[in-house]
A protein has these predicted regions:
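Active-/binding-site microenvironments in catalytic and ligand-binding cores
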Residues: 1-210
Length: 210
C-alpha cells in the first residue's frame, strides 16, 4: 500500500508566518573539529512547516499540544480536491462539493499545494483558507480534524475567527500540508506531533497510507 509523506521539510529557506522565527540549524559539535560526534541545534517556532494547533494557541485556556487526542490525529481521512478557481473555502464552496458521508477527518488540497510543488520559498499572503462561515460549516458537519495545505487554516490578517470557531468546538487543526502528489479520496492518516509540554502547537510528521 503506498505511503505519502505530506510533511514539509524543515529547512532554513522555508517560508514561515510573518513574525515567527526563521529556521536555524547550527552545528555545535563536529567530528571534523575533534568532537566525538556531530551534534546540531535546531531553533524554530512551533508553528513552522507541517504542524498542529492546540486550543491554547487562540483560546488561552491551557489546553496544550501534549494533550491532543491521538485517536483524532490518526485514522481514516478524506482528501478533498478543490478547483484552482476556489479562492476561499467558504460554506458555499463546501456545499457545492459532494463530500462522502461519515467523514470526520478532512484534508483540503487546493492550489496552495502547487506552491510546494514549485518550491516557492517566499511567504504568500493570498493563500486559500477557511473563513468563519466555512469553519462553522465544518463544525456543523461533525468534522473532528481539518487539514490545510498552507501555513494557516485562517485567511491572512483575519486569523482569529476561524481558529476560535474550530478550537472551541474541539476540532484539531493541522496546517502546512503538502498534498501536491495526493489524489482525492480516502486514506489512513497518521499525524504525530512532538509531545512538547505546555506548548500551543508542535511540528508533526504526517503521512497518508492508502
Amino acid at each position: 500500500m503506498p505511503i505519502y509523506d505530506i510533511t514539509l521539510t524543515i529547512s532554513p529557506n522555508m517560508p514561515v508566518w510573518p513574525g515567527d522565527p526563521a529556521v536555524e540549524l547550527t552545528q555545535i559539535a563536529s567530528i571534523d573539529q575533534g568532537a566525538n560526534a556531530n551534534v546540531s541545534q535546531l531553533n524554530f517556532g512551533v508553528h513552522t512547516g507541517t504542524h498542529v494547533d492546540a486550543p491554547h494557541h487562540f483560546l488561552n485556556d491551557r489546553r496544550t499540544v501534549e494533550a491532543l487526542p491521538l485517536d483524532v490525529l490518526t485514522g481514516p481521512c478524506y482528501v478533498l480536491h478543490l478547483d484552482d478557481n476556489v479562492a476561499a473555502i467558504t460554506a458555499d464552496a463546501l456545499e457545492a462539493v459532494n463530500l462522502p458521508p461519515g467523514v470526520s477527518r478532512l484534508l483540503f488540497r487546493t492550489r496552495n499545494s502547487d506552491l510546494w510543488a514549485k518550491g516557492v520559498t517566499e511567504f504568500q499572503t493570498r493563500f486559500v483558507a477557511v473563513p468563519l462561515d466555512g469553519a462553522e460549516w465544518l463544525v456543523r458537519r461533525g468534522i473532528k480534524l481539518v487539514g490545510v495545505d498552507y501555513l494557516s487554516v485562517s485567511p491572512y490578517k483575519n486569523s482569529r475567527p476561524t481558529h476560535v470557531a474550530l478550537l472551541q468546538a474541539g476540532v484539531v487543526i493541522l496546517e502546512g500540508l503538502d498534498l501536491s502528489q495526493v489524489a482525492q479520496g480516502f486514506y489512513d492518516l497518521y499525524c504525530l506531533p512532538l509531545k512538547v509540554a505546555g506548548s500551543d502547537g508542535a511540528p508533526a510528521r504526517t503521512i497518508l497510507v492508502g
